[in-house]
Amino acid sequence: MYVLHVCSELFPLLKTGGLADVVGAMPSAQIAQGANVRVLVPGFPAICAGLPDSDEVATLDTFAGRVTLRYGVYRGVGVYLIDAPHLYQRPGSPYHDQWQNAYGDNHLRFALLGWIAAELACNCDPFWRPQVVHAHDWHAGLACAYLAARGNPARSVFTVHNLAYQGLFNARHLDELALPHHFFQIYGLEFHGQISFMKAGLYYADHVTTVSPTYAQEITHPEFAYGMEGLLQWRAREGTLSGILNGVDDTIWNPASDALIARTYRRETLRDKAENKLHLQTAMGLEVNADKPLFAVVSRLTDQKGLDLLLAALPTLLEGGAQLALLGAGDAQLQEAFLAVAAEHPGQVGVQIGYHEAFSHRIMAGADVIVVPSRFEPCGLTQLYGLKYGSLPLVRHTGGLADTVNDCALENLADGSATGFVFHDANAADLARAIRRALVLWGRPTLWRYVQRQAMAQSFGWDLAAEHYLALYRRLL
C-alpha cells in the first residue's frame, strides 16, 4: 500500500504545534506495519536544511510559478519537499510575518501543497505513486479538491487536527488556484462567500477523521463546529467521519530513556522521578521542596487552552501550598497576567514565556500534575505525555482529554482505572474543585503513587493508531 501524507510541518525539522508531532511519528509507525509511506511538505528553510542531500524529481510550471519537487530520506521516511524559494524561503513562522500578519499569498503557498499532492497521484514521480493521499488540516485541504477535479486518481483521507483554523480566503483568489469554477458553491469549498481550505478537505475527501473519538462527535454540534455542523452531520450519517486517537512517539517521549531529563525512571523506579522535580524547581526559581505539590503548564496561552480559567482558579492552588511552573507563549494579556502572578508569588510561581522543546521534557518529568484546562481539545498530546511520565493530568472533559484521562473518583480508585483529575464545566469554580481533589490525593502519598503507576501503565503508542489508519485505507481501496 502506497500512502502520501500531506502536511505543513514535520517534527523535529519544523514544529509550531502538535500537528508536527503527529506527522513526525505516524509514517514511521505505518512503515513498521508494512506500508510504503512518504510525506509531502513545503520547502520551508528548516525543512530544506534537514534534507540537504535531496534529489530533484521534477520541475513544474504551476499557477504559483515554477517550482522544483525534490525527494530525500529523513530518519527512514521518504520526504518530498516543494522547492519554491519565492513562496517558502522566509524567516520565522511558516504562516505569518514578524508582526504576526498572515502572509498575503498564503492561498497560493498552501494551494500549491495540495496541487503537488494531486500531481504525485497522477504519476509526477515515475518511480512512486500513492494509492492514498492523507491530507492534514486546512493547509493540505485543497489536496482533496484537486484530486476530485482530476477524477480521483487516488483515494483521499482528510484529518482535522483543529477545526478552529479554517484557511479562509477571499473569493477573488479562486481564479488563481486552477480549480473548476463550479467547486465554489455550498456543495464544495465555498463558506459564507469565502474559499475555505478546511471545507475543501471536509467535503471532497473520501473519508474524514479527527484525532480522537470524542472530538469526532463534538464537531457535529454547533458549539464545536465553527459553522461546519451541517456538513459534518452529513458526514457522520454517511459513515465517513470517525475519530482515531493520536499516539505518543515512544522514541522521543519516554522517561526510561529520555536524555533531556535530569534522571531517567520507569514505573518500577518511580522514586527517581523526585530528582527531576528538584531540578525543575531550581530552574523555575521555585522553593526547592519535594513536599510541595508542583503543578505545571506547557501550552499556548490562549482562551481555547483555558488558561484564563487557571488564572481565576490560582488562589485555590496557591492557598493549598502548591507551586506552579508555566512554559508557554501566546496572548499578550495572558502572558502579562501570569508574569504578574509570578512576581507577586516568588518561589511559588515560575513562568517562562516562549517554547523550548527540551525544557518541556524537563517540566513533564519534574511536575506532579500537568494542567490542561482546555475549552476544547481535538486530541491533546500534553496529557498523554503526562500519563507517560507519571505527572498526573488535570484536564477538562472534552475531546481527546475525555478519551484518555479517568478521574480519581472513588469508584475509579477502587477498580484501578483512575489516572488523573477531570472537571466538566468550563469555569474557574469547577477547575478549582479539581485542584482541591488533587491536593487531597497529594496528602495520601501511597494512593498518589498508586495512581501514578496506573497512569504510566496506559498505552498510547503509535502502533494502534497506525493500525487503525491502515485498516481505513484498506476499506477505501
Swiss-Prot record:
Specify the superkingdom: Bacteria
Tell me which residues bind ADP-alpha-D-glucose.
K15
Q: Biological process GO annotation list?
A: glycogen biosynthetic process
Catalytic activity, per the record? [(1->4)-alpha-D-glucosyl](n) + ADP-alpha-D-glucose = [(1->4)-alpha-D-glucosyl](n+1) + ADP + H(+)
**Entry's EC annotation:** 2.4.1.21
The metabolic or biological pathway listed in the UniProt record of this protein is: Glycan biosynthesis; glycogen biosynthesis
- Annotated protein name in UniProt: Glycogen synthase
- Please give the organism: Edwardsiella ictaluri (strain 93-146)
**Lineage of the native species?**
Bacteria, Pseudomonadati, Pseudomonadota, Gammaproteobacteria, Enterobacterales
